[in-house]
């Protein structure tokens, strides 16, 4: 990798070499500054232009661009080029629905039903939902969008025995939590949520409009009602380039 080296004299007259600054880092800093000062949708100069301007290879340019795409600062559109990305959607970690979260940020939430049906609970899922292994579980898979842009793939699991005819109720209610409250008088009170990272599979990338292998945020939520009974187990995959989660922390009381 090409580097820039400069030198200066110290008070004693000796030559002191300063730290090497790889051209790659100068290029990436330039692009990063661009994402901070330019409006979303601003095109990034072509690879050959950047390579000539920074006297580096197109391979180096490609690496810098790809890293900023992964970080969600740039957006690559097939056949069109690379552009400054929109700011990430910021979501507080709290027990609210996707619909509530998006509307709180002035975004219009919509969902596309990918699959709905019954599966048989294995030992792990049975334990999460407090049902017998082999029991029926309603599995709902949805593509979550904000202002028409795909954001996440959400897969929800609920006990079919505890929530009979829920599948039909969801025809009337667009929000699952509203259906649980109004039809079954079940209100979520608390949940344990785990956040991990994963890489987009070909199917996930196709649904979310991202590159295969792009870092994803994988959330697992296990929710309980006011009596402490399990209500749902949800696994969601969010676009790492478009989403960030925010937690507010407090020191424990002495």
From Swiss-Prot:
InterPro entries: Bact_HTH_transcr_reg, Chorismate_lyase_/UTRA_dom_sf, Tscrpt_reg_HTH_GntR, UTRA, WH-like_DNA-bd_sf, WH_DNA-bd_sf. This is HTH-type transcriptional repressor DasR. The lineage of its organism: Bacteria, Bacillati, Actinomycetota, Actinomycetes, Kitasatosporales. SMART domains: HTH_GNTR, UTRA. It comes from the Bacteria. Its main location: cytoplasm. GO terms for molecular function: DNA binding; DNA-binding transcription factor activity. One of its GO terms (biological process) is negative regulation of DNA-templated transcription.
